[in-house]
Amino acid sequence: MRAVIQRSKEASVTVANNIVGEIEHGLVVFLGVQASDTEKEIKWMAEKIRHLRIFEDDEGKMNHSLQDRGGKMLIVSQFTLYGDCRKGRRPSYSQAANPEFAKRIYDLFIEEVKKSGLEVATGIFQADMDVQLINDGPVTMLLDSEKIF
C-alpha cells in the first residue's frame, strides 16, 4: 500500500460537477493498493497517517498529529501510485491491484480510519475526479507499507 499525504487548509473532490467530498484543515491522502495488501497493511497505514506529527505546535515545530488536532482526512483512491516508469515511456501498472480487490481494501482502509473518530471524506472509487486543495506549508509525505521510502 502506498500513500501520498498532503497537509491542506482545504480540499475537495468533484465528480461530474458535484462535490462528493470536502474537508477544511487536515490531510489529503492519495491511496494506492497492490495485490498483496492485507489487513496488516491497512492497519499499519491508517495508524501511521493518523499519528504522523506533521502539524506545528506553538513553537513552530512539527509536533502534533492529525489525531492530536482532531483534524479531517480526505481519502482519494489513486492506482497510479503503483505506476512503474523505470522502462520505456509508458508507465506499467502491473503492481497495482485489480479494481475489485483494490476497492475492498480502499473501503476497509476508510473504515479503519473512521474507527479512530476522525472525520473522513472520500472521492468515488474509479471515478474521473477533480481534486482541488490548498496545500498548507506545503507539507507532503510519501508512505509505503513495504517501507521502500
Swiss-Prot record:
Assembly and interaction partners: Homodimer.
Enzyme Commission code(s) on record: 3.1.1.96
Function: An aminoacyl-tRNA editing enzyme that deacylates mischarged D-aminoacyl-tRNAs. Also deacylates mischarged glycyl-tRNA(Ala), protecting cells against glycine mischarging by AlaRS. Acts via tRNA-based rather than protein-based catalysis; rejects L-amino acids rather than detecting D-amino acids in the active site. By recycling D-aminoacyl-tRNA to D-amino acids and free tRNA molecules, this enzyme counteracts the toxicity associated with the formation of D-aminoacyl-tRNA entities in vivo and helps enforce protein L-homochirality.
Gene Ontology MF annotations: D-tyrosyl-tRNA(Tyr) deacylase activity; Gly-tRNA(Ala) deacylase activity; Ser(Gly)-tRNA(Ala) hydrolase activity; tRNA binding
Organism classification: Bacteria, Pseudomonadati, Thermodesulfobacteriota, Desulfobulbia, Desulfobulbales
PANTHER family: D-AMINOACYL-TRNA DEACYLASE 1 (PTHR10472:SF5), D-TYROSYL-TRNA TYR DEACYLASE (PTHR10472)
Motif (Gly-cisPro motif, important for rejection of L-amino acids): 137-138
Catalytic activities: glycyl-tRNA(Ala) + H2O = tRNA(Ala) + glycine + H(+); a D-aminoacyl-tRNA + H2O = a tRNA + a D-alpha-amino acid + H(+)
Main location: cytoplasm
Keyword Nucleotide-binding on entry: no
InterPro entries, alphabetized: Daa-tRNA_deacyls_DTD, DTD-like_sf
GO annotation, biological process: D-amino acid catabolic process
Descriptive protein name: D-aminoacyl-tRNA deacylase
Keyword field: Cytoplasm, Hydrolase, RNA-binding, tRNA-binding
UniProt xrefs under Gene3D superfamilies: D-tyrosyl-tRNA(Tyr) deacylase
GO CC field: cytoplasm
Domain notes: A Gly-cisPro motif from one monomer fits into the active site of the other monomer to allow specific chiral rejection of L-amino acids.
Compartments reported by the entry: Cytoplasm
Family as reported in the entry's similarity comment: Belongs to the DTD family.
NCBIfam families: D-aminoacyl-tRNA deacylase
